[in-house]
């Protein structure tokens, strides 16, 4: 099986520049998903997910917006190794279902509405603790509530998701899986509300999850990845080190340590950790990707000229990306002038608005082309060829 760019334009483009337009499933190296908050209503958030699939130099991107995206996720992600999926992609694979079905499950569990839960959110209430460890029936009940909480969280029903996790914690208060789900939910709410206090509570929940003596290595490494995304590199590194010390290491932990080392500009450690990730790789595609990362950062570490070129490329890429965002905002500022000119029948105001928007959009188009050209790394062979010449 493979992914193929359909349509006449991708076909013509691949013919013109000789690029591939087909990617085998076995050649997928990375799957990353971004969540964009498109609208907020009564405590609930409407997410738009964008999943990027990379391999063999190709990038396929899919955006959510209906049942087609859910079918694509269900068909594409389950056969892939967890190593090549980021946290959010794993969540989508395991918990993405129709929002209407999720709401029906919440109603069946008598979980109150988001408006009611939001009014009660933050109030201090005593949480009963079980006198004895949960039995098999109670643990199964806690697992169901945890799954429901994750489904509600992925669908954007964040207050109801937090309530589902709270009920699961009443049954099994020390479970790392439940605490991890609750922490992820609190982090999402904190990002939506821009609440630093709630963000600290999310980090505290992640730290509580780390105390579970039953915690699995994969859960521990996923918590480390979440802590790194929450801008807590010290806690993330501690979690990844625990995976190494207690479980012998795994791919996600080694990759996470490499990203932390890269953040600190420690190229030798980056190379070391990507080499470890290569040893933990379960698929040829993952081994190929990690081997490429080792070669790339080794070239950066050994060749100052190549390092300077790449630093210049990244700095220029960041500058163009900032100009692209600014030009788009300027283009949007021109639309009110266009509307005012049309409403008051003043062609001068309308023409000024059209000029501002048109020029800004042209600049945005040029910046977008520049960003795409600079996104790819400079091949090291070009530097070697110049040195030989």
Model-derived segments and spans:
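Terminal and domain-flanking low-complexity segments
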Residues: 61-155
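Non-transmembrane, membrane-adjacent beta-strand/coil modules in membrane-associated proteins
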Residues: 2-72, 90-94
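TPR alpha-solenoid repeat register
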Residues: 144, 178, 219, 253, ...
């Amino acid at each position: 099986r493979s992914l193929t760019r359909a349509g006449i334009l991708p076909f013509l483009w691949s013919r013109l520049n000789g690029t591939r337009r087909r990617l085998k499933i076995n050649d997928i190296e990375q799957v990353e998903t971004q969540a964009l908050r498109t609208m907020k209503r009564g405590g609930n958030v409407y997410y738009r997910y964008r999943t990027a699939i990379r391999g063999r130099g190709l990038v396929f991107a899919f955006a959510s917006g209906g049942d087609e995206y859910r079918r694509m996720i269900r068909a594409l992600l389950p056969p892939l190794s967890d190593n090549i999926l980021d946290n959010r992609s794993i969540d989508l694979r395991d918990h993405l279902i129709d929002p209407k079905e999720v709401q029906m499950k919440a109603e069946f569990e008598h979980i109150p509405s988001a408006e009611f839960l939001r009014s009660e959110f933050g109030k201090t209430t005593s949480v009963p603790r079980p006198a004895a460890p949960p039995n098999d029936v109670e643990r199964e009940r806690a697992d169901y509530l945890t799954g429901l909480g994750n489904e509600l969280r992925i669908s954007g029903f964040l207050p109801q998701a937090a309530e589902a996790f709270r009920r699961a914690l009443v049954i099994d208060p020390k479970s790392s899986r439940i605490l991890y789900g609750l922490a992820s939910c609190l982090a999402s709410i904190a990002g939506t509300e821009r609440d630093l206090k709630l963000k600290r509570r999310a980090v505290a929940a992640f730290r509580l999850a780390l105390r579970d003596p039953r915690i699995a290595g994969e859960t521990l490494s996923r918590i480390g990845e979440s802590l790194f995304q929450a801008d807590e590199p010290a806690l993330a590194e501690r979690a990844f080190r625990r995976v190494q010390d207690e479980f012998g290491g795994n791919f996600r932990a080694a990759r996470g340590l490499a990203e932390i080392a890269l953040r600190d500009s420690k190229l030798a450690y980056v190379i070391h950790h990507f080499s470890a990730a290569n040893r933990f790789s379960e698929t040829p595609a993952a081994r190929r990707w990690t081997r490429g990362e080792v070669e790339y950062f080794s070239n950066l570490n050994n060749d100052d000229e190549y390092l300077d070129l790449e630093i210049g490329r990244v700095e220029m890429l960041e500058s163009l990306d900032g100009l692209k965002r600014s030009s788009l905002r300027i283009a949007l500022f021109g639309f009110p002038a266009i509307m005012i000119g049309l409403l008051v029948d003043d062609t001068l105001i309308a023409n000024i608005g059209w000029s501002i928007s048109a020029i800004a959009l042209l600049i945005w188009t040029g910046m977008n082309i520049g960003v795409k050209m600079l996104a790819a790394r400079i091949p090291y062979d070009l530097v070697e060829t110049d040195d030989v010449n």
